[in-house]
Amino acid sequence: PTEIEPFGGAATCLGGAIRDPLSGRSYVYQAMRVTGAADPLKPVSETMPGKLPQRKLVTTAAAGYSSYGNQIGLATGQVSELYHPGYAAKRMEIGAVVGATPASHVRREEPAPGDVVILLGGRTGRDGVGGATGSSKAHKLTSLETCGAEVQKGNAPIERKLQRLFRREDACRLIKRCNDFGAGGVSVAIGELADGLHIDLNKVTRKYEGLDGTELAISESQERMAVAVAAEDAETFMKYAAEENLEATIVATVTEEKRMREVW
């Protein structure tokens, strides 16, 4: 994604790295960034067809990464940028983080029929639709104009609220299983929580109107979490979320039938 939209791509490199351990209830306190680029001093006129100039990639990606890190309050103790002609065709953007949490905060159980899944955090938009395949497919001369929507739009303040909520033992102990929203959106993040699920896409909170069922199912909009809790704990968990100024909505129910069904 950094190759297509360097600011948002580098920002979600860090944001995505934070969300992975966060779904395991870990608080991230340190980061590392390693990138690869061709010569940024090369004249713009010598830029490969269909590519952004290396200078644009290098400076804008650094701004995107630092913007997200500053807003969420995360220190990046190691930053290295490698320069090699081989990165002219495709930039390298690697982020790594370190996190930890008290073992007493973590509860891991198999969700049971009747349990509910709460969508927590950011709202859903068209940003990130197709991102899972976009990061791996071959890019063409037209990619800069056609693939921008595949890059997720980060929202660090919401992720910081998620971090605050997940540092609360009373909230974390209610969570049986949790998933962050990466590749595949609702279909994967919620679909992986249990073998049997009934997902109501109409209840997914939206950034704006006009999204169809497919977009709601596969959008990779960031700063969202899916948590499975017992039905009797749902109201309490959503109260804790509201105390951290986070939106929380029940969007799915765990079923006995071992099949995922999405309705819209």
Q: Which positions does each model-derived feature cover?
A:
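Glycine/proline-enriched, intrinsically flexible loops and inter-domain linkers
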Residues: 1-264
